[in-house]
Amino acid sequence: MESQKKKDRYLRIYHQLKDFLVKSDDIDARMATIVAVLHHKMETFFWTGFYCLKDGELIVKTYQGPVACQVLKKNTGVCWAGINQGKTIIVPDVHQFPGHIACDSRSKSEIVVPLKDTANRIIRVLDVDSTTLNAFDQTDAQYLEMIVGLINL
């Protein structure tokens, strides 16, 4: 997708979500709404969901797409890299990422956006996979970070 078109789409999604999410302060409802809107509005999003930290494990929560890995092995894969590095991770080709966890063999690229709680601890990540190589860039990172920030409105 052309860069400006992608930015415009993300801005529309952001404002749409902001209007939706003020109606409930329930975190699960907010995550579900974010996932549903992103998954259906961004054509390259093949799997879209949240993994949450619980007792030192990453457990799948709300998602859309094919069946997910329920628990991600500690310190392995892109989601754990996002947590351990404390930043958004963009992987152009998941098959070149050491320790990549292949929940679905059709995934080719991935972006993971960590989300912190009010005490500044990472407690969950937004994970998005695509069946297209190099599907994600800094525009995706910038706007997905803004969008997941809406969870803590």
Walk through the language-model features, giving the residues of each.
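A short, aliphatic-rich beta-strand micro-motif
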Residues: 109-117
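Intrinsically disordered, low-complexity terminal regulatory regions
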Residues: 1-63, 67, 146, 150
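Juxtadomain coupling helices with adjacent low-complexity linkers
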Residues: 2, 18, 124, 130-153
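Short coil/turn motifs at secondary-structure junctions
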Residues: 55, 118, 131-133
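A glycine-centered beta-loop-beta connector
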Residues: 116-123, 128
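Short hydrophobic/aromatic beta-strand element in the GNAT-like acyltransferase core
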Residues: 47, 112, 125
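Regulatory sensory and allosteric helical modules in signal-transduction proteins
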Residues: 45, 53, 57-105
